[in-house]
Curated annotation (Swiss-Prot):
Chief place of localization: endoplasmic reticulum
Keyword Endoplasmic reticulum attached: yes
Top-rank taxon: Eukaryota
Record's protein name: Selenoprotein F
GO cellular component: endoplasmic reticulum lumen
Gene it is expressed from: selenof
Source organism (scientific name): Oncorhynchus mykiss (Rainbow trout)
Name of a matching Pfam family: Sep15_SelM
Tissue note: Expressed in the brain, liver and retina. Localized to the retinal ganglion cell layer, the inner nuclear layer and the outer nuclear layer at both parr and smolt stages.
Length: 157
């Protein structure tokens, strides 16, 4: 029953946001369950699963494929974590302790005492270009984001 209440609440929120034409922040999109890494063509598939009602919000959260094709690949990234706090972030812990980090060219795992998990994307000069917090990301979101931003060595791992 609580799932139905949540869906009704979500639908009313979507209708309100759509009515005002509000642009959603990437954080708001994540809280609604949408990844900003999704291509807008994914939103078009929602109708096949009887989810057409959430399509307007999906469209506000997605990236146009044109932008994705011309996306910038960063030469490197640093994933900073604290070894003692890693257990509080099981999704990040699962990613760090798996073989997945080896898939990404230029990805370094750096253990920084007391640090919450954060990803630092580096430009050609080694300066921080983007610094998204990954506190609430799951393992798949981290992997998907890195596959969009870094060169991938081997996807067979």
């Amino acid at each position: 029953m609580s799932g139905e209440v949540y869906i009704l609440w979500l639908l009313s929120l979507i209708q309100t946001l759509s009515a005002y034409g509000a642009d959603l922040s990437s954080e708001a999109c994540r809280e609604l369950g949408f990844s900003s890494c999704w291509g807008c063509s994914s939103c078009d598939l929602l109708g096949e699963f009887s989810l057409s009602s959430i399509q307007p919000v999906c469209k506000q959260c997605c990236q146009q494929e044109v932008h994705m094709e011309s996306r910038k690949l960063y030469p490197g990234a640093i994933l900073e974590v604290c070894g003692u706090k890693l257990g509080r972030f099981p999704q990040v812990q699962a990613f760090v302790r798996s073989d997945k980090p080896k898939m990404f060219k230029g990805l370094q795992i750096k253990y920084v005492r007391g640090a919450d998990p954060i990803l630092k994307l580096l430009d050609d000069n080694g300066n921080i270009a983007e610094e998204p917090s990954i506190l609430k990301w799951n393992t798949d979101s981290v992997e998907e984001f890195l596959s969009e931003k870094l060169e991938v060595y081997n996807t067979d791992l």
